[in-house]
A protein has these predicted regions:
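C-terminal terminal-structure detector
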Residues: 350-413
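Flexible, glycine-rich beta-alpha linker
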Residues: 121-128, 149-179
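Conserved Rossmann-fold NAD(P)-dependent oxidoreductase catalytic core, especially the SDR/UDP-sugar
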Residues: 98-131, 149
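A hydrophobic, helix-centered structural microdomain
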Residues: 219-285, 393-413
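A short, structured surface patch at a secondary-structure boundary
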Residues: 294-353, 394-397
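NAD(P)H-binding glycine-rich loop region in Rossmannoid oxidoreductase-like domains
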Residues: 54-95, 103, 119-124
Length: 413
């Protein structure tokens, strides 16, 4: 390990002495790839990477002496766990980021990999960190254009390193520490150092917008077990405690309009497998099978409008919960005839999830009349899902946020 001696590196990593950089740099250097670790404190960088023969270190001023760059990984940031005014955050997350981007542009770099926290994705977050990161991304994009590759990561970890906030887990040994961390992963999206390194070593722009890189919960047995228990518990509670409500709605529907009280329809399930969805009927018997937003409002019965508004029409989906064809939180199931939505969800990997009674998109009032927007919201949930997010979505639904799909305007005579 030496001070910068080459004029071209496979990777330049800014903020290399931070929690992410110190674990990412050695992974990037495997296989003989040359890495320049850049930071403000050269002594710290030397100590961190002294045993890495393909890693060299430099201060930020040394970037001016480089003539070429392949990939620049930008980690230097004023993070959300530090205090300061908006001006303080802009100084690092915008002005300093622009300085780095200008050096990258001068070197005619191929890829500017900008790493940010998933916290910066929250549209409602007006904290100095979130605001400054959004400004920084826009400023970098104006300088480097399509060479900018944004990636949003979750809580960072690496093997026996469980992140700064959970570093005490290492004292319990790898087995116990990993077991506790597995429980933590249910509560918060996480990102491993290896997955970030793999992305940096792979092709640019390989992630769908909004470029989220988190650990997959599909194989998290504890998360799956707890969500399944929650599904069954809620389903049984609905069917046992609300039996009189079921009966009253059934009778009211039969009296309100001709036709069965229960509406059964084939929908697209996990892995695009068909399943039968059950709801209380809210439309006139014989209404064409189509997306709700494609059906005229005149097809909705008087009682149906009330049931849809209060979400009582979805109570029979307790049957789907018990059968395991649906879960409490997930993408709302669509029809096979809604090809634009089906194809968009397939492209984003959404069908690895079970459909849900409520979901991330639903509480944001995104329905099936916006298929591409809906698919992207479903993808965002897939990448951000956790037990805490599921509970927040359930509580938001209980408080009345979101609703069913909009229906089309009434037919004109």
């Amino acid at each position: 390990m030496t001070i910068a001696s080459l004029r071209h590196y496979d990777f330049i990593v800014t903020g290399a002495s931070g929690n992410v950089g110190r674990h990412l740099v050695p992974l990037l250097a495997r296989g003989g790839r040359t890495v320049l670790a850049v930071g403000r404190d050269l002594d710290t960088l030397r100590k961190l990477f002294t045993d890495q023969p393909h890693v060299e270190v430099a201060s930020y001023d040394a970037l001016a002496g480089l003539t070429a760059c392949d990939t620049l990984v930008h980690l230097a940031v004023r993070n959300n766990d530090t205090r300061g005014s908006l001006a303080d955050f802009i100084e690092v997350n915008v002005d300093f980021a622009m300085r780095i981007a200008n050096e990258f542009k001068r070197m005619n770099g191929r890829r500017f990999l900008n790493i940010a926290s998933i916290l910066s994705l929250d549209e409602d977050d007006q904290s100095p960190y979130a605001v400054s990161k959004a400004m920084g991304v826009q400023a970098i994009r104006e300088l480097v254009g399509k060479r900018l590759d944004n990636v949003h990561i979750g809580y960072f970890h690496d093997g026996g390193y469980f992140g700064e906030k959970l570093r005490m887990l290492a004292a319990f040994g790898p087995a116990v520490g990993s077991a506790f961390f597995a429980m933590f992963k249910m509560l918060k999206p996480t990102t491993s150092a290896q997955s970030l390194a793999d992305y940096a070593l792979g092709p640019a722009h390989a992630l769908p917008h909004p470029e989220i890189l988190t650990d997959d919960l599909s194989d998290a047995l504890l998360y799956r077990a707890l969500t399944r228990m929650l599904d069954i518990g809620v389903a049984l509670a609905i069917m046992l405690l609300l039996a009189p409500v079921f009966a009253a709605i059934w009778v009211a529907i039969r009296l309100d309009s001709p036709g069965p009280a229960i509406f059964a329809q084939e929908r697209v399930g996990a892995a695009q497998a068909p399943f039968t969805l059950y709801k209380f009927r809210t439309m006139k018997h014989g209404t064409a099978s189509a997306g709700t937003h494609e059906v005229s409002a005149s097809a909705v019965t008087r009682l149906g409008a009330f049931l849809r508004r209060t979400k009582l029409d979805e109570l029979p989906q307790a049957i789907n919960l018990l059968r395991g064809t649906m879960t409490l939180v997930g993408p709302r199931p669509c029809l096979y005839s809604q090809t634009e939505l089906v194809e968009a969800r397939e492209a984003l990997g959404v069908y690895t999830l079970k459909p849900g009674i409520t979901g991330y998109a639903q509480i944001r009032a995104i329905d099936m009349s916006q298929p591409l927007v809906l698919a992207r919201a479903d993808y965002r949930y897939k990448m951000l899902r956790s037990l805490l997010l599921d509970l927040r979505i359930i509580l938001a639904t209980a408080r009345g946020r979101g609703g069913g799909d909009r229906v089309a305007a009434p037919d004109r005579p």
